Amino acid sequence: MTIKAIIHKSCRSVQSAPLQMVLVLNVAIYVALKALWLVGGESGIFDRAVNATVIENSFAGMLAHPWSVATYAFVHLDFLHLLVNMLWFACFASVICSVRDRSNVWWLYLTGAVAGALACMAVGGITFGLTRMAGASAAVMCILGAALAYAPRYRIKVALIGDVPLVVVVAVGGLCLFTETGVSMAAHVAGLAAGVIWGLSWRRSQRQVRRVTREAMIRESARKALLDKARTLGYASLSQTERIQLFDMSNGFKKD
């Protein structure tokens, strides 16, 4: 297999299975950092790796490591933090995969990460002093917000309980993810807001598609009625207005 084929296959895997890929990336990076911490000793390699990937609430830090606005969302330094984030990510990402194209999970994850990073720098630099932030919480909140805004009536199957409304699951997940304060809270709110905007934009586009489809069905029904009248009673039975309508509608369908 050529390098080009390997790259193409990898890109297709990333697009077709974003939920699994995000989980694998987060776990792999956590394991890699733990290995650096254990093996690196006092060499400082662990600290350098962390400093290069987490976000600082300062624009100077962002300019030094611009990629950190996205990479910090894949970095967890605590196992419990990783576990909670990935459990809620899997829960809400599965909802998105059920109601929208799977590739949206990637866009939501990265959008939430960037929104959280910007909130961290904007709010944290003013009120909380210099801090660093790592973890997928803002990205998960973005996916949570999008799922709730787009499919509020969705129901999730929970073992031993049955179907649970998404609103209830979101409430529980929100409480778990909103336990932080300060900079982290600002990042979570920013991620949630970004997700809600995504979800509402999806609903708006869906309503537009439904309206266009409904209007097309009405036009088609009227066109068929005029054609039936012309076949049954003859073209001469159509009024001048009906002939113009039939001509316009027929030309419209040909253009479509």
Predicted regions mapped to residue ranges:
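A detector for small-residue-rich transmembrane helices and their helix-helix packing motifs
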Residues: 1-227, 233
